[in-house]
Amino acid sequence: MDTKRLILFVIFSFSILMLWDSWQRDQQPPAASQTQTTAQSVEDGSVPQAAKSSASAANQASVPAETGFRLQSAERINVETDLYKASIDTIGGDLRRLELREHKDDEDQTKNFVLMDDQSAPMLYVAQTGLIGNGLPTHKEVFTSESTNYQLAPGEDKLDVRLTWKGDNGVEVHKIYTFRRDSYAIEVSYEIRNNSDTAVDPSVYYQIVHDNQSHQGSYMMPTFTGGAYYTEADKYKKLSFSDMAKTNLSKNASDGWVGLVQHYFVSAWIPEDGLVREFYTKKLSDNVYSIGSVSPLGNIAPGQSVTLKSRLYAGPQTQSELKSVAPGLEYTVDYGWLTVIATPLFWILSSIQKVVHNWGVAIILLTILIKLVFYPLSAASYRSMANMRELAPRLQRLKEQYGDDRQKLHQAMMEMYKTEKINPMGGCLPILVQIPVFIALYWVLLGSVEMRHAPFMLWIQDLSAVDPYYVLPILMGITMIIQTKLNPKPADPIQAKVMTIMPIVFSVFFFFFPAGLVLYWLVNNILSIAQQWYINRSTERAAAKKKGNARR
């Protein structure tokens, strides 16, 4: 196989892997139309139907499905903890705005990252809960609170925000948000006191409303923004907004969670253990969707009280924390079909970071470690290329000898390879084996929130973003040129031009890659150059020694 075919084979194989990886991953949904200017201008039909727990509940009239979606607003309750700045509306006790104090905005890092907001610019994203049946409060009813400002005091480990609703029939409902220090898991409780003369048989629902907008950027490939749920039976499932638009989800389960996933962050409702639940999705208007869970609570007799607890995880996709919150929540960190490779890579990378306390240095050390693991394969590849380099003059003479008779030329080349014990594919296959590791590391550096705004040194202050001055891509291009010089020079002028242009093309590609990935590739190239130079020198010495012995 000649140099041209080798180049085409490598490029084609790499392209197929990248395209397959891209196809396997859910694509980012198209931007929704900007017809609405504020969340309040949209119509509302967001109350789910009641769950059916018994024959009596089956006869109970569910809340009728309304058309459209309207998000109304009343008094706001402001909450501040070590991790959050939150805003709760007294209508429904909805969580209307949520800022993450430990994570900063992409455009202005003096501002907190806004995970949830009830405005449609840049996006509508709220968490709602409610009770259905017997006139109990849905997320449209007005609650009261003793205060409009709550703050987690120094030395305190938790903060309770209590909202109260009292019905005309005597039923009293308390909705309590419990924020805990150093935790992104918010406890949301209902205390239902039936002070009426008749039994009530309600259902409880938890849902997230989103308008299919996303301000999360990505590099070269889109990242997923959409719904997700997990059960022990079905495991982790994702639901794109286009899927929600086509059909409503209705999935019964006895465990699991439901939520919304976006680049680096996730919000998930985790109902109380043992509570039978139905996961659902609903298209509320042209671009507004809800995804949630509804559960029957059973009969609550007069004079009886019931307490129900659930959790809302709303925060970064920090893998160590996700595993401890709920089973399957760690799957929201999506590394695609190469998760089996990416997961241990991230574990090694994070273990190194805990020692060196710098993600950039950790990437460099991981690169060295990967290079050591693949050293035998790389050495075989470079040794094959070095041998091909030594044969280049003889190959040129064969081409001149046989001219356009490609069949005889091919036979002569194969005979020469056999005599010299050289595999022309020897320089290609070891490289192909390493490509899945490269792709897996790409998704680790792109999809891990730990990389977001992680500084390295000097001008690299965000390893998840592109190099602002393109220094790393340019340096990487220079190393590729050096590698090209170390490889066998193609006899065909067209092939030589291709080899000259490739470093420029790859450098342009890497202009749009995260700086952390370019750093990995740059360090890998530098190590490869050192290894290839050493092997070339060794091969040249061996060839010279062989010629000297032949003269004797």
UniProtKB/Swiss-Prot annotation:
The keyword Cell cycle does not apply. Required for the insertion and/or proper folding and/or complex formation of integral membrane proteins into the membrane. Involved in integration of membrane proteins that insert both dependently and independently of the Sec translocase complex, as well as at least some lipoproteins. Aids folding of multispanning membrane proteins. The keyword Chaperone applies. GO terms for biological process: protein insertion into membrane; protein transport. GO terms for cellular component: plasma membrane. It comes from Methylobacillus flagellatus (strain ATCC 51484 / DSM 6875 / VKM B-1610 / KT). GO terms for molecular function: membrane insertase activity. The chain crosses the membrane at residues 3-23, 359-379, 429-449, 463-483, 503-523. Residues 29-65 are annotated as: Disordered. Interacts with the Sec translocase complex via SecD. Specifically interacts with transmembrane segments of nascent integral membrane proteins during membrane integration. Keywords: Cell inner membrane, Cell membrane, Chaperone, Membrane, Protein transport, Transmembrane, Transmembrane helix, Transport. Belongs to the OXA1/ALB3/YidC family. Type 1 subfamily. It is found in: Cell inner membrane. This is Membrane protein insertase YidC. The gene is yidC. It comes from the Bacteria. InterPro entries: Membr_insert_YidC, Membr_insert_YidC_N, YidC/ALB3/OXA1/COX18, YidC/Oxa/ALB_C, YidC_ALB_C, YidC_periplasmic_sf. It is a multi-pass membrane protein. Its main location: membrane.
